């Protein structure tokens, strides 16, 4: 009888310890990255941050909004990170959105954008809308 009680106690202790040691998945969050820099260091940083945010919780939602010279990250022939952008789009909850005004000002055609990059009417307006909707804000730059 003592043996049965000891075994039962040990089983309960193991179950409680295992449940206690499991850390709950953090609640998903939404973050908008504001990219206006053509600097490759900044572009690499945003790719790294996307992967880190995704690693915390795969349900986290992200958006990179590019305007000004930030468009270089997703323009064929100007970016050295095309495969990293494609991988991020394919394997994380991230959208890459470019500003239509910046495209017009820089004479960039939609055909020059990497696949699956989306166009928004106004980059600044997009960032503000995300902030108003409760998204976290990260300015990409150094």
Regions found by a protein language model. Name each.
Residues 1-8:
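Bacterial N-terminal signal peptides that target proteins for export
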Residues 19-142:
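Secreted/extracellular ectodomain signature
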Residues 8-16:
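Bacterial N-terminal signal peptides
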């Amino acid at each position: 009888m003592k043996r049965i009680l000891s075994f039962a106690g040990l089983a309960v202790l193991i179950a409680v310890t295992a449940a206690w040691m499991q850390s709950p998945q953090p609640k998903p969050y939404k973050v908008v990255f504001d990219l206006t820099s053509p600097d490759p260091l900044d572009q690499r940083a945003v790719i790294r941050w996307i992967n880190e945010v995704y690693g915390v919780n795969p349900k986290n939602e992200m958006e990179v909004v590019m305007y000004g010279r930030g468009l270089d990250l997703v323009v064929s022939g100007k970016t050295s990170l095309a495969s990293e952008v494609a991988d991020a789009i394919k394997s994380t909850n991230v959208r890459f959105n470019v500003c239509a005004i910046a495209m017009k000002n820089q004479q960039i055609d939609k055909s020059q954008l990497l696949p699956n990059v989306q166009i928004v009417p106004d980059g600044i307006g997009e960032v503000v809308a995300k902030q108003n909707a409760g998204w976290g804000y990260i300015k990409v730059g150094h």
